[in-house]
């Protein structure tokens, strides 16, 4: 079973809110998940990110893969080393 750490969309139309979850890579984006480890609210200024670092590190040690967006959030939160992606053409 390939496990991914990714975002699950919540909220209302035109007002997204994301939960950071650990899920089987074959399950749909908003479908079944194993564990919730944080949230991301892009509407607030500045955007609010809260990640349970202990749970995240535990899942990464177990071999969970990060989605691209989750990886950038983890870098910004300082959970994993690296540089935040920039939008360069």
From Swiss-Prot:
Report a single Gene Ontology molecular function.
structural constituent of ribosome
Q: Does the keyword Ubl conjugation apply?
A: no
Q: Which Pfam families match?
A: Ribosomal_S16
GO biological process terms on file: translation
By its UniProt entry, which Gene3D superfamilies does this protein fall under?
Answer: 3.30.1320.10
* InterPro entries according to UniProt: Ribosomal_bS16, Ribosomal_bS16_dom_sf
Keyword Ribosomal protein, does the record have it? yes
A GO CC annotation recorded here is: small ribosomal subunit
Keywords, A to Z?
Ribonucleoprotein, Ribosomal protein
Family under the similarity heading: Belongs to the bacterial ribosomal protein bS16 family.
Name of this protein: Small ribosomal subunit protein bS16
Species of origin reads Desulforamulus reducens (strain ATCC BAA-1160 / DSM 100696 / MI-1) (Desulfotomaculum reducens)
């Amino acid at each position: 079973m390939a496990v991914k750490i990714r975002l699950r969309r919540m909220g209302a139309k035109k007002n997204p809110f994301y939960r950071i979850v650990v899920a089987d890579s074959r399950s749909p984006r908003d479908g079944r998940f194993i564990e919730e480890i944080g949230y991301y609210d892009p509407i607030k200024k500045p955007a609010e990110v809260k990640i349970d670092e202990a749970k995240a590190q535990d899942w990464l040690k177990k071999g969970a893969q990060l989605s691209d967006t989750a990886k950038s959030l983890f870098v910004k939160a300082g959970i994993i080393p690296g540089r935040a992606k920039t939008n360069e053409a």
